[in-house]
Amino acid sequence: MAATILYPGRNWLTIDGEVVVINTLDEEIDGKSNPNDPSGVDNASKTGLTWAKYLGTGPTYYADMWNANANTIMFRYAETLLSFAEAKNELDGPCDSVYVALNKIRFRAGMPSVDKGKYSTKETLRELIRRERTVELAGEGFRRADILRWKDNNGKVLAETVLNGELKRYVGTVNYDETVPEKRAVISEDTELVEKRVFVSHNRYLPIPQEYIDLNSKLVQNPGY
C-alpha cells in the first residue's frame, strides 16, 4: 500500500527537498488551518487518501509542472500478464502458464509465489487474479471497466455492488511524536460521510454529448440520459 497510497502520517519529500508528514486528519496544525484538511478546502482529497503511485519525490521532480521529467507509462507488461492469466483461467482453469504469469508480477514486487494448493480451482484462482489486478493496476484507469465486466457468484455485475453506497473518510489525528509513519495516524471509531454514490444499470454506458447529437440527428442518446 505504501507504494500506492499517500496516507496520514507518512513521510513525504517535497519539491523543496523538505521532509514533511502527510496530515489529512487534523483541521489545524500548530494553531493554523491545515491546507490538506479534506473538510476545509476544495482542492484536497475528500477521503484523506491520495495517490503516491508514479509520483517522484524531491526537487528534481515536477519543479516545473510544464516540463516534468517523469516518464509517462503508455503500456504495462503487467497488464498483459494479468489479462492473459484471467483469460487462460476462464478458458482452461488453473494451469502452469497462469501461475507463471502471476508469479512474474509477484516476484518483481518481492512477493512469494502463488500458493497452488490454496488457489487450485478456477473459482479461487479467479478471485486471486482479480485481487492481483486490483492491487497492481490501482489508479491506472482499469478499475471501472473491470468491475463492469466482472460478476459475482450470483451473476450480478460487481459495479452494481461496489459503486453503490456511502463513501466515508476516517476521523482522527496525527501523532507527530511517533517515529514510525505507519503508527502516526490515531484513527477514531467514527467516520464522516463524503458522499452517497448511486450506480444503476444504465450507468454502464456514458451519455453521448449533446453537441454530437445536435450535429447528427441519427445519433440516439443512450438509455437513462
Model-derived features: positions:
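Acidic/polar-rich alpha-helix caps and helix-coil junctions
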Residues: A2-Y225
